[in-house]
Amino acid sequence: EVECLVPDLGGIARGKILPTNKFVKGLSDDSHRMPQSIFIQTISGGYATDDDDELPIDVYNPTDIDIILRPDFATIRVVPWYDDPTAQVICDAVNLNGSPVINSSRTVLRKILKMYDDLAYEPIVSPEVEFYLVKPNPDSDYPLEVPIGQSGRQETGKQSFGIDAVNEFDPLFEDVYNYCEEQKIEIDTINHESGSAQMEINFQHGNPLELADQVFLFKRTLRQAALKHKLYATFMAKPMENQPGSSLHLHQSLLNKKNKKNIFYSKKNTISNLMKNYIGGLQEFTPKLMPIHAPNINSYRRLFATWDAPKNTKWGIGNRSCGFRIPSNEEYGMRIENRISGSD
């Protein structure tokens, strides 16, 4: 079988599962199709509407016409948690006339990367994804509970960067790393965050589209691995009232495409003028992009909590209270860490 996946605007995997022969046939006759409305579908299954409870006709045809899923074969991978051989491939969404679907997240990102390419810039990103492991919770009316690890005990205190606290779930993370290796998801460091059974996994830095695809696949991978170990994994921004929220910190830098030099760095002032302008752009447009940074009602519980989620667009060197932190002032590591986005 082949899973044809497309990330919707909430990062949920939509698509179709096809027999291999039907998948191959669909490559020639464009029969891999879904309704256009998937890109205005919310995480709860409803549809995004405007203030008058109308669908946004500028990005949606009221007849809910088909769109075509075009596989991006650079993303084809084995699905490692199935017993039967199964492949997965991320698809680009195109209209029936062959034009890109404008509200597909991959279309938007490709357009942005083309703008950088025209300026001879090469953007580099590295995500840090936080999440919670929790006991299975089939009834959402009940609050989430901290799971029990290998020791048979439930974590009660805050174990920020605790090694043994991570090792409580070592069998799970062994599977996560193995699954990721099979899928070419380049995860790096894991550490315990300040919440009970709250973890963070870092990704290797690289191309923004490739990293976006990897994070999309990683979330699905972690959830499946957790289920195997009779746990749930959640990327909710604020899943438990008395625990810290979960963030998706995005480290970002710019290289000169020709000589691969970090153009955020200046020998004279350490921070280049272009980097200051870049930060200014983030400060200007982040408030307008909060539906992206905080897409759900729950997202704002994280931002208004008393924990270390930033509630500003200030920047500072090594300052975690700022929305935009500069972790290093050396040439190789000169970058901006956007700390505003939730993990959802």
Predicted ranges, named:
Residues 89-95, 199-205, 252, 338:
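Short, hydrophobic beta-strand segments
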Residues 151-172, 178, 260-297:
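C-terminal helix-cap and adjacent tail motif
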Residues 142-151, 248-256, 313-315, 320-328:
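Short beta-strand elements
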Residues 7-10, 26, 39, 210, ...:
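C-terminal accessory/tail domains of diverse enzymes
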Residues 129, 193-201:
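Short, conserved phosphate-binding/catalytic loop or strand-edge motifs used
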Residues 1-189, 211, 231:
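ATP/Mg2+-dependent ligation/transfer catalytic cores
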Residues 78-85, 123, 190-194, 243, ...:
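Short glycine/proline-enriched loop/turn "hinge" motifs that connect secondary-structure elements
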Residues 198, 203, 210-280:
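Acidic, glycine-rich loop-and-beta core segments that form the ion-binding/anion-interacting portion
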